[in-house]
Amino acid sequence: MSNHHAYQMSNHHAYQMYAHITWHTWKRVGCLDAAAASDVESAVTSACQASGVRVLRSAVLADHVHVVVSFRPDIRLSDFDRLAKSVAATRANRRVPGAVRWARGYFVTTIHKRDLPGVTRYVADQFQRHPDLIPKKSGHNRML
């Protein structure tokens, strides 16, 4: 559906569920360079395909990730988060061993449809809010 405010349908169920998920690197180390950020974005896409979650907006910064999603009622967002983090770290660490390590856990809050535009705008504005955390295009940031 092109309108993410409409109800979604799945196996005789109608639903309208949204969440804002964030997770960060171990000790908030700014280890996500541009290549690792690309790995995170593709890992989130893979996790979405595997778990039935749909990304509405995301932002990958040097030390944390924001994702606004819609999801079915039978989805466990903890499974989505675990898969996205695992795939992202695996991909990034193939290029530079030990480059990306995530902190345990994540933050998630549900979003009412009336608040969805504001939350997606907040996530879209992350690079303006944190210009010092925009992933760099060159070099390999390694964790100490």
Predicted regions mapped to residue ranges:
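Basic nucleic-acid-binding interfaces
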Residues: 1-144
